[in-house]
Amino acid sequence: MLRDKLVETALEWQKRFGVAPQITSVVSEYDSAMLVGMLEKDYSDFMQDKTAVQKGFDFIFKGKRYQIKANRPSGKKGSKVTWVPKAKNYNWDKLIWILYDKNYVMQEAWEWDVESYKTAFAEIKRLSPEHYRKGICLYRK
């Protein structure tokens, strides 16, 4: 599987050069699409004309715009995840946050709809994993 090859290459790079390439975004977008039931071919077809800087959402599935956020600790001392990325806008319908382990293995995934997210987090400057864990659990290892 292509995802596994990408992860293997990134981990080898990290082993050799100390820092992994930034693949967490693309891996988490792919994993989220698979998690909500999108077929790999449909995801591939959707992404063909997209750019890495698309504003608002990462993909559309069953009429819903999905914004994806993720964290992956490097495994080095002090790399524990204590903050999570906050959505910069509300041009989406569903947000999924994924926490990976150091090997890009999904540990948990949580979903928020845009209105619940706004209500819960609009006034909070810095979000932690505990904030996102108040959403709907899509996966927990």
Q: Where do the language-model regions lie?
A:
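Nucleic-acid endonuclease domains
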Residues: 1-65, 69-141
